[in-house]
Amino acid sequence: MQLEVNNMWISFSVRYLVNVEDLNNVESAGNYVRHRRAPLVFKDKDSYTVTYVPAVSGEMIAHGYQMNLVELALQRNLPVDSLAKQGILIKRGSDDKVHEGTKCTDEKGSDYELCVINEDIVEDVAGFMNPNKLVKRTSNVAFSYMVPAIDAVKASTISSQFHVRYANKELMDKYKNENIQSLYNIETASASYVLTGYLNVNSVGKTQNYPVKEVDKKKDREKAALDALMLTLTQFLFGAKLTRFKPIVEIEALFVSASEKPFNLPPVTGDIKKYIDLVNSTTDSFAKILNIKRPVVKYYLKEEKGNVNTPIDAFTVM
């Protein structure tokens, strides 16, 4: 059973085994670059405890998603703002002076929102807010922080890697007052990570402010938003330093659901069979209470048999 694309809420929950990654730095102190950390609370025997673990922010993942969306939109002749084409994801705001060439300056309310999303698919999918126009467009896509799964917290680790930027003696003599040759340490992390989020397909290509209006090629925009999500999650197309710190990644599990109303999958953690039972019972209850079709759930499992053969096939819920 599949749902109509124009009435769909996509939820995902993915678990990655990631080794030696430097996807998200937060600061440098001298020649030492730190990996992002986040506090994680988990139950240890009979009590709760807190520990700090490696993490990748939802903002970092959303940036990767939006750039994947830009690439697809350009290939499919969908509108992209000139800044977004350069990888600069600055959304509309008060006293906006950076979006040159916009035709939305004199518009207000729903007309202003419609004008903006007509000009830029990124702001259509990922939202914006302009207080001067009293217009707020909530993002249609959401990503959690990527953190170690609760059952694998103790197996996550951060360690520093020593590097040298080399310069020969001739260059060092020529540039004595500059730091031509340098030593530096960069933290890398390894963990079994979980990531969750959603894509509100139904709200892509139409205004959230009343009166509700739709753009042209709404279906094409919905498809681009879905395809960008598939690329981001299955091909691990997000994060920093991918050219020299490209992590070793395995998808351990990927669950994707499609529903008429907002239904969000829990993080993939613990015993996988118990997790599947929980998802199945929850979808049954969800459909019964709201008197709607049961959410469609497709899932890929590395060590067990899922109901699809590859992570990409999980997106056949579309």
From Swiss-Prot:
Name the record gives this protein: CRISPR-associated protein Cas7/Csa2 1
Family from the record: Belongs to the CRISPR-associated protein Cas7/Cst2/DevR family. Subtype I-a/Apern subfamily.
Keyword presence, Cell inner membrane: no
Repeat among keywords: no
Superkingdom to which the source organism belongs: Archaea
Gene Ontology biological process terms from the UniProt entry: defense response to virus
Quaternary structure, from the entry: Part of the aCascade ribonucleoprotein complex, minimally composed of Csa2 and Cas5a, which binds crRNA. Other possible components of aCascade in strain P1 are Cas6b (SSO1437) and Csa5 (SSO1443), while SSO1399, Cas5b (SSO1400) and SSO1401 have sometimes been seen weakly associated. Csa2 is probably the major RNA-binding subunit. The Csa2-Cas5a-crRNA complex also binds target DNA homologous to crRNA, probably forming an R-loop. Purified aCascade forms a filament about 6 nm in width.
Function field: CRISPR (clustered regularly interspaced short palindromic repeat) is an adaptive immune system that provides protection against mobile genetic elements (viruses, transposable elements and conjugative plasmids). CRISPR clusters contain spacers, sequences complementary to antecedent mobile elements, and target invading nucleic acids. CRISPR clusters are transcribed and processed into CRISPR RNA (crRNA).
Originating organism: Saccharolobus solfataricus (strain ATCC 35092 / DSM 1617 / JCM 11322 / P2) (Sulfolobus solfataricus)
Note: The aCascade complex was purified from strain P1.
This protein's UniProt keywords: Antiviral defense
Gene name tied to this protein: cas7a
